[in-house]
Curated annotation (Swiss-Prot):
Pfam families: AP2 (PF00847)
GO molecular function: DNA binding; DNA-binding transcription factor activity
Tissue specificity of this protein: Expressed at low levels in flowers, leaves, and stems, and at very low levels in roots.
Name the UniProt record assigns to this protein: Ethylene-responsive transcription factor RAP2-1
UniProt KW keywords: Activator, DNA-binding, Ethylene signaling pathway, Nucleus, Transcription, Transcription regulation
Family matches, as PROSITE patterns: AP2_ERF (PS51032)
Compositionally biased region (Basic and acidic residues): 1-10
Length: 153
């Protein structure tokens, strides 16, 4: 029995040490109020105050767009004291967002405004990213059914 334990500890000692990554680092979400689906889309949702229900804010291609949609919704639900992902960006849009109207705004209108901002950010990010179709030159394939001319050989 002791010999088995010694062999087990010897095997453990022979293995090279592995770097340990804390669980909270590996599973940390990039932004508040969003999550990633298995197929890669990012979704945003928020809990309504004093309710168990969640307010669906939409599905987006980028995490930034989902986070911006969340920021708009949380601002409308909780006011200027809300914890935001991008507080500087919301301050730039302050003329569009009025904290005075947040208290009685219906959930459908909050969802609509958040989805509008998220879609706008998604579109901006998609247009800013260079498209693979535009950056690669077209490939000209030769017709293999024709006999090559002497200059082509």
């Amino acid at each position: 029995m002791e010999r088995e334990q010694e062999e087990s500890t010897m095997r453990k000692r022979r293995q090279p040490p592995q770097e340990e990554v804390p669980n909270h680092v590996a599973t940390r979400k990039p932004y508040r109020g969003i999550r990633r689906r298995k197929w890669g889309k990012w979704v945003a949702e928020i809990r309504e105050p004093n309710k168990r229900s969640r307010l669906w804010l939409g599905s987006y291609t980028t995490d930034i767009a989902a986070a911006r949609a969340y920021d708009v919704a949380v601002f409308y639900l909780r006011g200027p004291s809300a914890r935001l992902n991008f507080p500087d960006l919301l301050l730039q849009e302050e003329d569009h967002l009025s904290a005075a109207t947040t208290a009685d705004m219906p959930a459908a209108l909050i969802r609509e405004k958040a989805a509008e901002v998220g879609a706008r950010v998604d579109a901006l990010l998609a247009s800013a990213a260079p498209s693979m179709a535009h950056s690669t030159p077209p490939v000209i394939k030769p017709d293999l059914n024709q006999i090559p001319e002497s200059g082509d050989i």
